[in-house]
Structures are given as structure tokens and as C-alpha cells.
Amino acid sequence: MSTLKADTIVAADGSSPVTLTKQTTVKSYAKGSDAAVLAHSHNVSSGTDNGGGDYSYALTNAMSSADTAVVVTPYTNISRAGINNPNRDTASVMAGVILNPYSGAYSDMPHTMIQTGDLA
């Protein structure tokens, strides 16, 4: 591991302060049989089970944009998983885990949700 010691860090122009981006990955794991109970999380304050396989998570720190990349992976051999979030916002993320691709029916199951993007 390296150590960086500096009194001042400046941008490439030599005089202005460096603009640092505040990027992070949001990660949560929920068992969704009765509620979106968090087993492990980063930047997620709580989870809500909105009905069969339909979960939403409140973020501790808002994202800078509602257009973020979200991936949901179930811990079972199902046909597919996806995001059902028609009303995106910067303070929460919604995860829908789909059991049957033919009927589009949701099913409660343990899953991992990962969201990437810039914090506000």
C-alpha cells in the first residue's frame, strides 16, 4: 500500500483546485419473503417489500441523477431478473425480481441489487 502526502493538490492548469468526483457503488442484499430485509448494504437506509418480488430501497445519500445503472441478481435459478422503476428519482431505487418471463409475475426471493452512479 502506498501513502500520498501533500500540502496542496491542484488541477492541471496549476492554480485551480482539483475537482474530485464522488462516485460510489450502492449494494444491498435483501431476503424478500415478507420484507426487504437488508443483510449487507452500502448507502441504503431501508428496504420496502411492495408485494411479490417488488422491492424498493431508500438511499442514505441521494444520487446526482435518476439515470443510473442498476443490476438485480436473484439467488436462484430463475429465467430472468430486472428493474421495474417507471418513476425514477435520486433518493431511491426499485428492484423487481421476475420469476416467470411468460406471465411477467413477480416472486419474492433473496437477491442482490447494485446501483452505480455519482452521489449528489
What are these regions (language model features)?
Residues M1-H40:
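Intrinsic low-complexity, repeat-rich intrinsically disordered segments enriched
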Residues V26-A120:
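Extracellular attachment/recognition segments
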